[in-house]
Amino acid sequence: MTSPLALPTVHVHTDLAATFAAQRQAFSSHPMPPAAQRLQWLKSLRQALLAGQQALIEAIDADFGGRSADETLLAELLPSIQGIRHAERHLQRWMRPSRRRVGLAFQPASARVIYQPLGVVGIIVPWNYPLFLAIGPLTGALAAGNRVMLKLSESTPASALALKALLQRVFPEDLVSVVLGEVEVGQAFAHLPFDHLLFTGATHIGRQVMQAAAGNLTPVTLELGGKSPAIVSASVPLDTAAERIAFGKTLNAGQTCVAPDYVLVPRERLQAFADAYRNAVHKLYPQVANNPDYSAIINPRQLQRLQQLLDDARAKGAEVVDLYPDENRQGRRLPPHLLTRVNDGMQVMQDEIFGPLLPLVPYDRLDEALAYINQRPRPLALYYFGYDRGEQAHVLQYSHSGGVCLNDTLLHVAQDDLPFGGIGPSGMGHYHGHEGFLTFSKAKAVLTKQRLNVARLIYPPYGKALQRLVYRLFIR
């Protein structure tokens, strides 16, 4: 059966190029949309999402083969709406030119930075949060005054069609265009000469996107992933840490780029934490097999990948504990698992898990835990559980990650006034809030001179007394 997103090969490059050209022409005709116009775009987007939420919920549920409506509301629609409202409240301040200081030697003059739209922005959206990870960057790009092309994931065809229909009702194609299609379409999309390209997805695909963009010298923002660690301190109540880690790990069945990937636990507390985690998970989900609150794995390929991680770990000596051993698995709902006695030779400790499998790693000293993290690629998120402010400061100072959440998981991503982005292999650049506006804007430096031109006193021919005075005052 042909995918509903499939496009005839002959049309891929032609259609994309035509859409891009139409947006480029529209931008050339209106290169600096006023605040009122941008606010109307944002308002229209917000109202359309609210009006069309049920269709989006049903489409996402269909794509996952079981996704809680409440999870979609809380993890996709709510942050999308809140992000739009945040941009609406602050847009005029963000657009205001920023006055800058002019050095004494260059007076009289004034300096300012003005924020201009870049032009046509490309956004490549992943499958795990097909709404939020489209609307979040779209909000920043529209707030900055750009035209936008979105490439939606072929792994979530129902969601892609629903979001495309919604956006087509709100925006003309030369303002916001939604592109559907398989891998070949995505590859062609990444080769378009965008003024900025934002990609969210796997690290190895991010490398390919960056290589494609480099051919056009297109700047990129890459939101990737990695193995985001959680550290449980020696003093934090285990029930508290376990409950919050369980929520972060099981939301969307762990298919979250900032989900805690593994947990570092004081050696003497390892078994107690495992027990607390089991209890916390069972409180959240008394059962998983027929529980509409618990999301399914997106497709058979991802389910098989996760099963292979379990099989590999078990074969190499890990203790693998299914937290729901008595249930008959139905569909693609994979129960949460705990893994102990893990080591670096296991694939589960090398790859981003992206599922409800949680390895536990013992440590004896906090610096040992930090060294373990720092010896590995820099993660997208880091979580620390402990109320000692000295230890909190130590963790912040001696670790690198895209973002940090102290005493909870995931929630830093939902803060509209905090930037979201990775570091190193987990990504580059930021969006959300003001940082999103800046990412999709050109900060243009403007210096304005007055009629009096003191600078002419240092023009050639050189060797004048005033030039020697300037050297003495400023550089010698």
Tell me the role of every PLM-derived stretch.
Residues 2-3, 10, 34, 326, ...:
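Conserved C-terminal structural/oligomerization subdomain of aldehyde/semialdehyde dehydrogenase
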Residues 10, 171, 204-343, 366, ...:
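ALDH superfamily catalytic-core signature
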Residues 31, 46-49, 53, 64, ...:
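Structural signal for hydrophobic packing residues in well-ordered secondary-structure cores
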Residues 38, 84, 145, 176, ...:
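Residue-level signal for inorganic ion chemistry
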Residues 104-240:
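Rossmann-like NAD(P) dinucleotide-binding subdomain of oxidoreductase/dehydrogenase enzymes
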